[in-house]
UniProtKB/Swiss-Prot annotation:
GO biological-process terms attached to the record: translation
GO CC annotations, alphabetized: cytosolic large ribosomal subunit
Alphabetized UniProt keyword annotations: Methylation, Ribonucleoprotein, Ribosomal protein, RNA-binding, rRNA-binding
Stated name of the protein: Large ribosomal subunit protein uL11
UniProt-recorded Gene Ontology molecular function terms: large ribosomal subunit rRNA binding; structural constituent of ribosome
One Pfam short name: Ribosomal_L11
Post-translational modification: One or more lysine residues are methylated.
NCBIfam families registered for this protein in UniProt: L11_bact (TIGR01632)
CDD domains in the cross-refs: Ribosomal_L11
InterPro entries referenced in this protein's UniProt entry, alphabetically: Ribosomal_uL11 (IPR000911), Ribosomal_uL11_bac-typ (IPR006519), Ribosomal_uL11_C (IPR020783), Ribosomal_uL11_C_sf (IPR036769), Ribosomal_uL11_N (IPR020784), Ribosomal_uL11_N_sf (IPR036796)
Family from the record: Belongs to the universal ribosomal protein uL11 family.
Amino acid sequence: MAKKIIGYIKLQVPAGKANPSPPIGPALGQRGLNIMEFCKAFNAATQGLEPGMPIPVVITAYGDRTFTYITKTPPMTYFLKKAAGIGKGSTTPGKGSAGTVTMEQVRDIAEKKMPDLNSPTIEAAVQMVVGSARSMGLQVVE
């Protein structure tokens, strides 16, 4: 018989820096899960990644107070800001430009994000990345 799922917890946690302080502690504590067990497992799983990189994680909480988790690829905005060399996007997208990214960089980002995107082809994924770049106020150049 399968375990009873009592909920899903979606968080964005910096790679290798999971600790019991908010937002992780309260989110897991409400479901009665072992906070330190998650922190140790997550930090071990993200050890090889760039420290501080935001990693989306979906934690599945079960009725017997156990859990499983799935890590995803970092947000598209993280990759775009890194490629453009900026700290944050434009406050007025469409009017002011925050920076530029090349189509080669966009294609690179699309290939990294492909497992998490619901697009059938790389071309469709590239269009998603271009749309995100424009909404951040970044110009996409050839």
